[in-house]
Amino acid sequence: MSFNALKEKGIPFDKQLRTWHDIVKRPYNRVEVDCYTRTRQILMNGIETEAWNFKHHFGRTCDDLELVKKIAQIRKIENTQQNTVNWLAPACQTILDTTLGYEQVAVDLTAWLAQNEPDNYVRETFNFGLLEDFDHLYRYSQWAYLTEGKNPNDILQHQTDVIIGRPTQNHHNCNAIRIRKHYDKTKTSPQTKVNILTLLSGEQQTHNYYAEHGFMYGNDDLRRTYAEICDVEEEHVTMYESLIDPTETMLEKWVLHEFTEVCTYYNCYKDEVDEKIKQVWEEFLAMEIEHLKIAAEFFEKHEKRDAEELIGTEILLPCHFESQKNYVANILETEIDKRQDGTEEMGYTTIDKLPPDWASYKVQQTVGENGAPTEQTIINICATLGRDIVSADKKLVQKQAALLAKGLEPEAQAPNTVTVKDYENMPDNSNFEELF
């Protein structure tokens, strides 16, 4: 069905204020909820937070009073939208439960976007980040058992594999190396622009969640694990935002933000299986259609251009959630040794081709001098169970040692690194579900 967001009818802006009872709705059931309902809720929380952040920055840098007032009015509505979406999570869902949900978003969303990204360089960047978030899911899954005695599939529902990725201790870089070549706003498709904003919003929300909640556990190793992975999420935000053309005007950015909200809410509405939450996506889609129209009016007034030049006439689907096991496994086996080269080309290389003075070596050696928390995670689970918790096809599990041998940098290993030999010596754990 054709859906031109600028031509659709939404909720009039003067009808968008809601009561507190409507803003704070009943949360979903932690036990019964579909895992991808949870991922949609997590992502849309990030989408709304990015919209709120952007409009505050816009308001601080704009001297057009009419525009600043309208931005402030829309921002108030979007703040309440964020409240609604965030409050859909139940109080009985622990921080680690939610963390597994965040990493499921990161893995399955990034894989979806990579497969639906027309720009080869942007797709390569998505795949690069994918293998890092995949390893984060593996590390946090150990803590779900160590801290709360939980099976990670209570949250993941067997839709996303749990197995080693590119080792987290090797994710720490000179942040300048993370900067990527930006797209040309005059040549790049709306699909690429929306894809980047969608993933950027999710990664930014992940960083913020870990920064604001990781300290709330008492176990020092777990607290440090949150700190370590939070640092990587900062690098991911840096990496993805650098893909955006810095010459975009603030009005162009505003239109793109509103269009991204329309697309993501539309996608959530089309896919949602929970009827009560589907109503939330439908209502907020109708609100965002009007926000987009307002942004388009200001864009056309000030820049004398039609907003369709930016966003086209078709809706996009940037956040369809489904199992991505086969795609992720293929990227894992072929790209686990990939690294950012640190050259003016802002490209990629492999571990064996890194120069001795690669800037990220010093960063990794410094932060890992006393050990890497994410390596201690595996030491702790092995001390408890004799090996790590994994959930994947047995053939893939049997490749863990080989994957580590390919993906672990020999030059910057923390003193507590779990070695390839350690993985080779781990007993079979294909029946780990029997623990629960």
Name each model-derived stretch.
Residues 1-436:
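Non-heme di-metal
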